[in-house]
């Protein structure tokens, strides 16, 4: 009869031997090596263009490009920047626009006064119903 400790040690040794054999066999198969290379090649290949414009959950996660663009909102395209007008050009246009606005204001105010006067005259001359 063996002691319980010896039985446990024997069972552990046999289980360790089995697992190590399995791991060695898996690591040496050419299929697993090809699978690892395939995964690495997919990671480093450039993203393919995808022209799907849908933003549903299925379309946002169907490829890495759509996930980055639609899911995360990251876009690496060059954005078009507006051209700023030179300071001198701004000063010239602002002074010219101020000169144009002054006569327009006086033109609009005069017809409104005339309309108010005609409305007041019409109300004053119209006979109203008394009490």
From Swiss-Prot:
Interacts with host CCNT1. Associates with the P-TEFb complex composed at least of Tat, P-TEFb (CDK9 and CCNT1), TAR RNA, RNA Pol II. Interacts with CCNT2; the resulting complex is unable to bind to TAR RNA. It is found in: Host nucleus, Host nucleolus. Residues 121-131 have a biased composition (Low complexity). Residues 67-77 are annotated as: Core. Residues 109-120 have a biased composition (Basic and acidic residues). A motif (Nuclear localization signal, and RNA-binding (TAR)) lies at residues 78-84. Residues 92-101 have a biased composition (Polar residues). It holds the Pfam family Tat. Belongs to the lentiviruses Tat family. Residues 80-131 are annotated as: Disordered. InterPro entries: IV_Tat, Tat_dom_sf. Transcriptional activator that increases RNA Pol II processivity, thereby increasing the level of full-length viral transcripts. Recognizes a hairpin structure at the 5'-LTR of the nascent viral mRNAs referred to as the transactivation responsive RNA element (TAR) and recruits the cyclin T1-CDK9 complex (P-TEFb complex) that will in turn hyperphosphorylate the RNA polymerase II to allow efficient elongation. The CDK9 component of P-TEFb and other Tat-activated kinases hyperphosphorylate the C-terminus of RNA Pol II that becomes stabilized and much more processive. The gene is tat. One of its GO terms (cellular component) is host cell nucleolus. Residues 50-66 are annotated as: Cysteine-rich. This is Protein Tat.
């Amino acid at each position: 009869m063996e002691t319980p400790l010896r039985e446990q040690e024997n069972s552990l040794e046999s289980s360790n031997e089995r697992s190590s054999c399995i791991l060695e066999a898996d690591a040496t198969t050419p299929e697993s090596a090809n699978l690892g290379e395939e995964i690495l090649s997919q990671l480093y290949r450039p993203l393919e263009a995808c022209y799907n414009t849908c933003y549903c959950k299925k379309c946002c996660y169907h490829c890495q490009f759509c996930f980055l663009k639609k899911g995360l909102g990251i876009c690496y395209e060059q954005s078009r920047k507006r051209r700023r007008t030179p300071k001198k050009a701004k000063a010239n246009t602002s002074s010219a626009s101020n000169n144009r606005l002054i006569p327009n204001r006086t033109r609009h105010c005069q017809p409104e006064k005339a309309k108010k006067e005609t409305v007041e005259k019409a109300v004053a001359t119209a006979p109203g119903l008394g009490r």
